[in-house]
Amino acid sequence: MSSHIQIFDTTLRDGEQTPGVNFTFDERLRIALQLEKWGVDVIEAGFPASSTGSFKSVQAIAQTLTTTAVCGLARCKKSDIDAVYEATKDAAKPVVHVFIATSPIHLEHKLKMSQEDVLASIKEHVTYAKQLFDVVQFSPEDATRTELPFLVKCVQTAVDAGATVINIPDTVGYSYHDEYAHIFKTLTESVTSSNEIIYSAHCHDDLGMAVSNSLAAIEGGARRIEGTVNGIGERAGNAALEEVALALYVRNDHYGAQTALNLEETKKTSDLISRYAGIRVPRNKAIVGQNAFSHESGIHQDGVLKHRETYEIMTPQLVGVSTTELPLGKLSGKHAFSEKLKALGYGIDKEAQIDLFKQFKAIADKKKSVSDRDIHAIIQGSEHEHQALYKLETLQLQYVSSGLQSAVVVVKDKEGHIYQDSSIGTGSIVAIYNAVDRIFQKETELIDYRINSVTEGTDAQAEVHVNLLIEGKTVNGFGIDHDILQASCKAYVEAHAKFAAENVEKVGN
């Protein structure tokens, strides 16, 4: 019988530390709901003491989820622990995650503390946290660069103070397979407690070994894995949870352990995070990449046609990738469109389907067939526009002279107010973005601009991601349209709208 490996998702906390990623309040809530649907055991929803925005989003997630534990991060500070308590007290399963650095380099250069000071702080703050929470998780930050005897002392101190979950972070992705497994074996053999202690692994991918080390931790005695969807996170990112889960599923013969994830929700979860983070999943990414179940070699294709297991160790359906696609066309009616939405797993009410059907027909008039990916794109674009405080109403472009373009942009807010401005620039994109900047009355720096095609072919929809720096804050925007310039404008407007929403501003004169 397989043992249960808990999944601790930190996409909303560690994942959001990815450069350029800044989820909105609504996006955080939607992500949390999808993670619960995916079946994760614990969601680290944020760091409540870090900002009012983080506190409010953690609080909203705690009040919304019904089965998944909601965790908040706290330094060894009573005010941090209090903030987590206030944010998560309405959760079905509240958890606090207390941490302090323990490695020599952190003690000397960051904390300016002795080992004795650190041990005293662990005892004081874990004891305090235990008075407020049934479940306290403790992490010795930079554990893999901490002397093992001192690490054992830190963990024993935390356990004696009431921690029942011990997380061992490979904070800078420094460890390797055997070394990391040895740390867990040493702790499980050395630390004593009358309570059951769950050991957890938290690996970063600086040397490309986050998933491998996470699996090594299980071999060493870990019963919980921490990570993010698609492996997003600071620097090179975190362990990709979908890869860990599928490795355990496919190689259950070796690990004898399984997660409780609903694996069929994996692709949908990955796509959601990719869209909101503005980070496209690489085509060759394991499990969820576009090429994960593709076979180009003639020998491979022949083998798969004869028997799929010749070159596939898991099925696309296992992770929610459909392979029995029946495209729609311009003659497809409302009923066929509605049935397609159901088949793709969308529970959309009839009123919302009316607008989606109009968008579908507009695309169907321009394409021979509308694929499942087109349908997903329509819904994604609609969700973004529905959530936005402002959205693009119209865009007009005109060639002026000597390479100059003129752009007139009209934006509408949720109350129906119209904002319009125009500008000239060296090229269409510059003209459009100058006009939008004038509407929102903000100086911006365009950090990143990317165009992806939703499907193959010259008639594909365009998916545009932008990353802007506005008043020192990084925001991303996303736009989908059959016209690249329309998609580019939608993405830029959305980025401005996100900034305005986070700062509760109105635009225009």
UniProtKB/Swiss-Prot annotation:
| Cellular-component GO terms for this entry | cytoplasm
Q: What is its EC number?
A: 2.3.3.13
Task: Specify whether Manganese is a keyword of the entry.
Answer: yes
Using the UniProt record, give the first listed, main subcellular location. cytoplasm
Q: Which reaction does it catalyse?
A: 3-methyl-2-oxobutanoate + acetyl-CoA + H2O = (2S)-2-isopropylmalate + CoA + H(+)
* Gene3D superfamilies assigned: 1.10.238.260, 3.30.160.270, Aldolase class I (3.20.20.70)
In this chain, Mn(2+) is annotated as bound at 14, 202, 204, 238
Question: In which pathway does this enzyme or protein participate?
Answer: Amino-acid biosynthesis; L-leucine biosynthesis; L-leucine from 3-methyl-2-oxobutanoate: step 1/4
> Keywords in UniProt for this one?
Amino-acid biosynthesis, Branched-chain amino acid biosynthesis, Cytoplasm, Leucine biosynthesis, Manganese, Metal-binding, Transferase
The enzyme's first-digit EC class, named in words, is transferase
Required cofactor names:
Mn(2+)
**Pyruvate carboxyltransferase domain mapped to chain residues:** 5-267
Keyword Transferase (UniProt) = yes
Q: Where is this region: Regulatory domain?
A: 391-509
| Pfam hit, one | HCS_D2
Where is this gene product found? Answer: Cytoplasm
- Give the record's family classification: Belongs to the alpha-IPM synthase/homocitrate synthase family. LeuA type 1 subfamily.
Tell me the NCBIfam families matching this sequence. Answer: leuA_bact, PRK00915.1-3, PRK00915.1-5
The subunit field of the Swiss-Prot or TrEMBL record says:
Homodimer.
- Entry function: Catalyzes the condensation of the acetyl group of acetyl-CoA with 3-methyl-2-oxobutanoate (2-ketoisovalerate) to form 3-carboxy-3-hydroxy-4-methylpentanoate (2-isopropylmalate).
Q: Provide the protein name.
A: 2-isopropylmalate synthase
Organism of derivation: Staphylococcus aureus (strain MW2)
